[in-house]
Amino acid sequence: MAEAGESLARLVAELDGLGSACVAFSGGVDSSLMLAAAVRALGAERVVAFTAVSPTYLPEELETARRVTRELGVAHEVVETHEFDDPGFTSNPRDRCYHCKAGLLDEMAAAAARHGCAALVDGSNADDLGDHRPGMKAAAERDVLHPLLAAGIGKEEVRRLARELALPTWDAPQQACLASRIPYGESITIEKVAAVGAAERVLHGLGFRQCRVRHHGNIARIEVEAADIGRAVGARQEIAQRLRVLGFAYVTLDLDGFRSGSMNEAPEDVAASGLTPAGAGTA
C-alpha cells in the first residue's frame, strides 16, 4: 500500500490543473476526502460543495455535510432532487440509480455553471468499479470527474487518508440512498423510504452504527455487522416493537449480517445459499 503522502499527492495532482471545482458532496467519507483534496489543490475560494436533499437520504447526512463544509471553509449549496417525479426511478428497475443520478447531476451541472466552476467532481473511488453502479454511466455522460478513481485510491485508503487529515467522517459507516433497501421491481414511494429511514434511526439509536433495514412489503429484514448479531438478538423485543409501530408486521434478522450491495446478489448466488431470492436493489 502506498504511503499516505504519496496517495494524497496523486489525488491533489488530479485536481491541480482544474482552476476551480464543484464537488458532489454527500457528507460521507469518500466525498469528504474529495472535498478536502480540492481545497488543498485549488484553495477553498475556488471550491463549491453541492449536497442533494431528498426523502431518500437521512437528514443526519445533510447535518454532517454542513459541518464538514464549515470546517473546510467551503461554500455549500443544497440541491433539491426530483426523482419521485420520474417513473424511471419510482418503478424501480435495475438501472434505477441511473435515472436518479442523471436528474441530480443535471441539477448540479446547472448550479456549477452558475458558479463558473470548471469541473464537477465526485467521490467515486477505485473500489466502486466492482459493484453494480448504473449511476456511473450517468456521470460519464455528463463528464463528471472521478479524481479518487483516477488516482487509484480505494475505500481502505480513503479512510486512512481521511483519518490522517483529521476529517470527522473518516470512520463514518457506509451510507446509501434509502431506495436501495427496496427490491428491484417493487415501486418506490416516499412512505416506504420514510419507514426504512425511521427504522434505521431506531437501530442507530441502539448503537448499531452499520446497518440496513431491507423493505420486503410488511417484512423488515435487518442487517447488522456480524459481530453485532448477538446484541441484536438480545434487543429483539425492543427492536420488533418499535419497528411494528412503523408499519412492519414482521421483523427479521439476516444471519448473513450486513453486506453492502446485498440486494444486488445474483439469483444463482442466493440459490447456492439455499434461500429464495425476493428481489434486488443497491447499497
Located regions from the model:
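Short amphipathic alpha-helix segments
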Residues: 190-210, 239
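Short, structured loop/turn "capping" segments at alpha-beta junctions
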Residues: 154-160, 167-176, 209-211
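C-terminal boundary motif of the adenylate-forming
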Residues: 209-216, 254-255
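Generic alpha-helical secondary structure
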Residues: 8, 105, 189-196, 232-237
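ATP-dependent adenylation/nucleotidyltransferase module used to activate substrates
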Residues: 1-164, 205, 220, 238-248, ...
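Internal, active-site/partner-interface "lid" segment
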Residues: 172-192
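A short interface-forming secondary-structure element
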Residues: 215-217, 221-233
